[in-house]
């Protein structure tokens, strides 16, 4: 069977080595004679798995000791509400930086739960010569007392990424769903990091939360117990039955990433993949991208065919060539190639070859 390269934005492809190992262990995990999906989450064997998973993630991301690592339900959208309910209290205010679809969704959820009076926002994307560009504000010049400032460093729908570290006088809450472990960051700069698993960690249904200890002292609002960070810390992420199979696969992805050289190594590969694809787009008048070079996403490359009438044919022929899930988000249209950690360099080579051949044929 010819290679299939899955460019889906999420749920995204998983490393082939992880998938093969899961396949081999599906009916008999760790010599138990049953699947990992069938054992108690409180068994010593599964507890050992969770401890190793946290240890590997801490090592990969160099997470300081004063941070808790939580494996929770709900995905990224679940955390939109959890952040508000855990940190805002009845009187607190927060600032949301809006750079695209996902930060807008987080803002809308915060305003729904807390009311617009408690939630301020700033649009940080401007047009520069017709292209989207991020302009980070000087937050130190804002006269306000916020519990936290929220932002999304990578917008998967819009193809926008913020590479500069945010400088804030208030705790930073970041949605890293699409960039976690794709490049190195300084975790100590953040009050809380959250990430839906289905892009760079594992299957959907799991979210990772990395929260600094002092954040748990902020006033909270009444909320569901399963989204209460304090209860999650107290119960080692097992206040209720966790998504065990997703946790198992996340553990395998962490181990795989360590075996490939860690985040510093995969970051170089990710940069190379993105550069190859953007060079193809920029070097061919057949395609265009709407983001300034400094803010082009490494994880989610969005592009359009100049002749949009060829979109359907492009997708059809790409599918035949084994290049799947290239259709852009319904809100923005066009094309999108998601280049998460599991996407091999060969996938980009194949995509670039196809794009060049398609352009030559239809120009």
From Swiss-Prot:
Organism superkingdom: Bacteria
A GO molecular-function annotation: pyridoxal phosphate binding
Biological process per Gene Ontology, one example term: pyridoxine biosynthetic process
Listed pathway(s): Amino-acid biosynthesis; L-serine biosynthesis; L-serine from 3-phospho-D-glycerate: step 2/3; Cofactor biosynthesis; pyridoxine 5'-phosphate biosynthesis; pyridoxine 5'-phosphate from D-erythrose 4-phosphate: step 3/5
Disulfide bond sites: none
Residues that bind L-glutamate: 42
Cofactor comment: Binds 1 pyridoxal phosphate per subunit.
Coiled coil regions in record: none
Names of required cofactors: pyridoxal 5'-phosphate
Annotated residues for binding of pyridoxal 5'-phosphate: 76-77, 102, 156, 175, 198, 240-241
Primary localization: cytoplasm
Top class in the EC scheme: transferase
Enzyme Commission number, as recorded: 2.6.1.52
HAMAP family: SerC_aminotrans_5 (MF_00160)
General function of this protein: Catalyzes the reversible conversion of 3-phosphohydroxypyruvate to phosphoserine and of 3-hydroxy-2-oxo-4-phosphonooxybutanoate to phosphohydroxythreonine.
UniProt subunit comment: Homodimer.
Protein name listed in UniProt: Phosphoserine aminotransferase
Gene: serC
């Amino acid at each position: 069977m010819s290679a299939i390269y899955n460019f889906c934005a999420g749920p995204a492809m998983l490393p082939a080595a992880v998938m093969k190992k899961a396949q081999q262990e599906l009916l008999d995990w760790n010599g138990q004679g049953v699947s990992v999906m069938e054992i108690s989450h409180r068994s010593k064997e599964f507890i050992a798995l969770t401890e190793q998973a946290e240890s590997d993630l801490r090592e990969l991301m160099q997470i300081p000791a004063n941070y808790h690592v939580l494996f929770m339900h709900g995905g990224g959208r679940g955390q939109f509400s959890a952040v508000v309910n855990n940190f805002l209290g009845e009187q607190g205010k927060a600032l949301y930086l809006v750079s695209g679809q996902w930060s807008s969704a987080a803002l809308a959820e915060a305003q729904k739960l807390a009311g617009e009076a408690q939630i301020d926002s700033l649009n940080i994307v401007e047009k520069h010569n017709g292209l989207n560009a991020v302009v980070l504000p000087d937050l130190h010049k804002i006269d306000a007392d916020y519990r936290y400032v929220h932002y999304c460093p990578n917008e998967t729908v819009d193809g926008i990424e913020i590479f500069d570290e945010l400088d804030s006088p208030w705790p930073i809450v970041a949605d890293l769903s699409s960039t976690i472990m794709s490049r190195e960051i300084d975790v100590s700069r953040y009050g809380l990091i959250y990430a839906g698993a289905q892009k760079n960690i594992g299957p959907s249904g799991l979210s990772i939360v990395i929260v600094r200890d002092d954040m748990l002292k902020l006033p909270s609002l009444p909320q569901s117990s399963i989204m209460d960070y304090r209860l999650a810390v107290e119960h080692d992420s097992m206040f209720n039955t966790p998504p065990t199979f997703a946790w198992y696969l996340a553990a395998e992805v962490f181990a795989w990433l360590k075996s490939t050289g860690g985040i510093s190594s995969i970051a170089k590969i990710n940069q190379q993949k993105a550069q190859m694809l953007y060079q193809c787009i920029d070097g061919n008048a057949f395609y265009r991208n709407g983001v300034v070079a400094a803010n082009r996403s490494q994880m989610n490359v969005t592009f359009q065919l100049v002749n949009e009438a060829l979109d359907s044919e492009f997708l059809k022929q790409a599918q035949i060539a084994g290049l799947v899930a290239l259709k852009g988000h319904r809100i923005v249209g066009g094309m999108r190639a998601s280049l998460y950690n599991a996407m091999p360099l060969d996938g980009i080579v194949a995509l670039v070859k196809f794009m060049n051949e398609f352009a030559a044929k239809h120009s």
